[in-house]
Regions:
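Short, contiguous pre-domain boundary segments
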Residues: 6-23, 178
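Short Pro/Gly-enriched beta-strand edge/turn motifs at strand-loop
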Residues: 41-54, 122-126, 299-304
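Short clusters of hydrophobic/aromatic residues that line enzyme substrate/ligand-binding pockets
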Residues: 47, 95, 121, 214, ...
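Rieske [2Fe-2S] iron-sulfur-binding domain
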Residues: 52-174
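Generic structural signal for secondary-structure transition and capping sites
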Residues: 40-44, 93, 206
């Protein structure tokens, strides 16, 4: 007889790989708080694109689980981008209120403490003799910029970001993400636990029934024989248009360290389709060093909750951020060549059409899923082989959140694990 009495730990310890998760894991408030600490505050999180803060003093805010982070351009041009908590070191007042802005320095409007763009305390009037300003800088977070994308980590002992960036540099290089700009960015609030949103993204078993707009042009659900034939064609064509072939799957339990998940996988578009558009036609100028279409698209992952879809002419980024036990933000960013001009080189409504309608459908699916797993009579069912990627994610999640004797601290830490 199992001696574990905590229903959450019992569910984690008795879960069987290849099955959906038990319902309690989607609606236990204490578990949700532990997820924030164990997963989100120890992972590398995508917070924005460098083009959002081009000038010295430009900043954006990233908020998660009650924490607000200032991400600021500290030097001009290609200079340093840093991240710090949006909390005054005097009595804790919030420094910045607007989602984006520009400041020559950060001034607390409560008692006037003033900070430089690097977070150092520059001024604090009428403090007693012996007050050491150097000990009261804003708390800095680890921050890295890779391929134009900005990442932060709350953990002081976070895993080396280079584990992610070194693996992904060559595969992403042809797309020139550092030379893109944001054509559109939109948030899709989903009334569900964050795990259901990520699970849904990690499988395409539902694509045929739920996403006809996607399925008409993408080869994720076609028979293996047809898949293999189309893949052979794009593998032959890719070098001719400036694309190299890589296959990376170092995520979840195979990441080598916590919070540096990365993957890169090409797959075929169906014949007659060049991009993720309504009619399969080109949507925007080619990205980076790409000179033509090879008939394929790319799925990639950067960290545990950021995913991307790269076409030859644009990139779509998905970021999932928990906002509460049953609330998740799905933010989508569409990137195009930095030289592209809206109205001349691309039509914004056509550019976003596919993943806008697909995400609206996903929102309905996921919210319906949440309602079902909340039922006291819900029982986890078996997964399809087409949900293998999602199953890898579930195995990692259960291992991360279990409090068993065999669950080592190294798995939860920033350091490497076996």
């Amino acid at each position: 007889m199992n001696s574990v009495k905590d229903p959450v730990q019992l569910a984690l310890q008795t879960w069987g790989s290849g099955h959906a998760l038990p319902g309690v894991l989607y609606h236990d408030a204490a578990l949700y708080e532990r997820e924030i600490q164990r997963i989100f505050f120890r992972s590398w999180l995508y917070v924005g694109h460098q083009s959002q803060i081009p000038r010295r003093g430009d900043y954006l805010l990233f908020e998660i689980a009650g924490e607000s982070v200032i991400v600021v351009r500290q030097d001009e041009g290609e200079g340093q981008i840093g991240a710090m908590l949006n909390v005054c070191r005097h009595r804790g007042s919030k420094l910045c209120d607007t989602a984006t802005g520009h400041e020559a320095r950060f001034v607390c409007r409560y008692h006037g403490w003033t900070y430089g763009l690097d977070g150092t305390l520059r001024g604090a009037s009428q403090m007693p003799e012996g007050f050491d300003r150097s000990r009261h800088s804003l708390r800095r977070l680890q921050c890295r910029v890779f391929a134009g994308l900005i990442f932060i980590n709350f953990a002081a002992d976070a895993a080396a970001f280079e584990l992610l960036s070194d693996d992904m540099a060559a595969p992403l290089a042809p797309y020139g993400l550092e030379h893109t700009k944001i054509a559109h960015r939109q948030n899709y609030p989903i009334a569900s636990n964050w795990k259901l949103a990520v699970e849904n993204y990690c499988e395409c078993y539902h694509c045929g029934p739920a996403h006809p707009e996607y399925s008409v042009g993408h080869g994720r659900a076609i028979p293996k024989r047809e898949w293999d034939h189309l893949m052979h064609e794009i593998l032959a064509r890719a070098p001719q248009v400036g694309l190299t072939q890589h296959h990376i799957r170092r995520m979840w339990l195979d990441a080598g360290a916590f919070g540096v998940d990365r993957s890169f996988e090409r797959y075929p578009l169906l014949r007659g389709h060049q991009s993720g558009s309504r009619d399969g036609a080109r949507l925007a100028p080619f990205l980076g060093s790409i000179t033509g279409f090879d008939g394929g698209a790319t799925d990639f992952q950067l960290g545990p909750t950021t995913f991307g879809l790269a076409y030859c002419d644009h990139v779509v980024l998905y970021r999932f951020t928990p906002r509460g036990l049953r609330d998740t933000d799905c933010e989508i960013t569409w990137l195009v060549n930095e030289s592209a001009v809206e109205g001349r080189d691309y039509d914004r409504e056509q550019l976003i059409w596919l993943w806008h309608v697909t995400t609206l459908a996903d929102k309905t699916i996921i919210e319906r899923n949440q309602a079902g797993v909340d039922s006291r009579y819900y029982e986890p069912g078996p997964l399809s082989p087409m949900e293998d990627f999602a199953n890898h994610y579930l195995r990692w999640y259960v291992a991360t959140m279990s409090d068993t004797a065999g669950q080592t601290e190294r798995l939860r830490s920033g350091g490497q694990h076996g």
